[in-house]
Amino acid sequence: MIYKEVQIGEALLRIYVLSNYEDIDINRKRAFIIIYPGGAYCRCSNREAETVAIKFNAMGYNCAVLFYSVNNIDKTEYSPSKQYKTLYPKPQIELANTIKYVRSHCEELNTDPNKITIMGFSAGGHLVASLGDYWMKYGEDAKPNAMVLWYPVITSGQYAHECSIHLLIGEDKALMDMASLEKHVSQQTPPTYIWTTKEDQAVPYENSLLYADALSQNNVPFCLKVYEKGCHGLSLGTQEVTESTKPVVPEIQDWPELVDEFLVKTFRTRF
C-alpha cells in the first residue's frame, strides 16, 4: 500500500492507495474514492474517515480522506446567537483542488482519472453535493465522476441542519439560496448514490428526498436508499465506529456493497 499525506491549502489529504503486483496486474488503474467526513463544519469526524477508506480499499478502490477546513468548535457549545468565522468558500475550494490533485497524479496513484468518486457524510455530504452542483466554477479537471452522499445536509430551507449552514455561510442571507443545493442540480451533476435513515433526528431524511427529486427532474442517474432504523452519524454501522452510548445497527451494514454495485454499474468496471 502507498500511504502519504498531502497539504491541500490548509486541508490535509491522507491517501491510501493499493499496490499493484506482477502476479495480478502491475498496470492496474483503479477507481478512486475521496472521503469527506461529517461534523457539522465544527470538526471532521474520525468515525467517518480511515475505517471507511480501509473498507473500500478491501473492495478494490484507492481511497483518500480530506480533513477540510472547519471551525474547530465543540458541537455541544454551538449557539445560533453567536458569531463564527464564515467558512465559505474555503472548504469548496479545497475539495475542488483535491480532485485536481488526484487527477493530476493518477499515474503515481495507480488511478483511472475518469473514475473519481467523492463521498461525503452529513456536512461532508453538503460539501460534496456543492461541488456536484458547482464544479463548473473550478474547471473540467475538478469534475467528480460520481458522488455518494451519506445522510447528507442538503438544504438551507425548512429541513436545514442549522449548525452546518450557519457555520458555512454565517449571517449572509445572499448565500442562503446557494446553500440550498437541491435548487442547483443540473444535467451536469454527476451520478449520485444517497442513503439516509427515517429515524435521523439531526439531519431529517427530507434533505435526501429533496436532492433525489432534483436529480430525477434533471435526468441524472441516482439511487436513493432510506433505511427504516438508525440515528444520525452511523458511519459503517459496525462496533468499530459506533459511539459507546449508541447501539450497533446491523440493518445498515450492507450499504458499502450497495455503493459498490452502483459505482461498478456507473463506471462499467472497478478497474
Task: List PLM regions with ranges.
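Catalytic nucleophile-loop/oxyanion-hole region of alpha/beta-hydrolase
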Residues: S45, A64-P113, E251
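Conserved alpha/beta-hydrolase "acid-adjacent" motif
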Residues: Q201-L210
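Primarily recognizes the serine-hydrolase "nucleophile elbow" in alpha/beta-hydrolase
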Residues: A96-S164, D172-D177
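Short beta-strand/loop motif that positions the catalytic acidic residue
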Residues: Q188, Y193-T196, D200
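C-terminal catalytic histidine-bearing segment of alpha/beta-hydrolase fold enzymes
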Residues: D74-T76, S216-F271
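N-terminal cap/lid segment of alpha/beta-hydrolase-fold proteins
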Residues: M1-R28, Y88, E162
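Short amphipathic alpha-helix adjacent to the substrate-entry channel of hydrolases
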Residues: N46-A64
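Short beta-strand element of the alpha/beta-hydrolase
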Residues: K29-G38
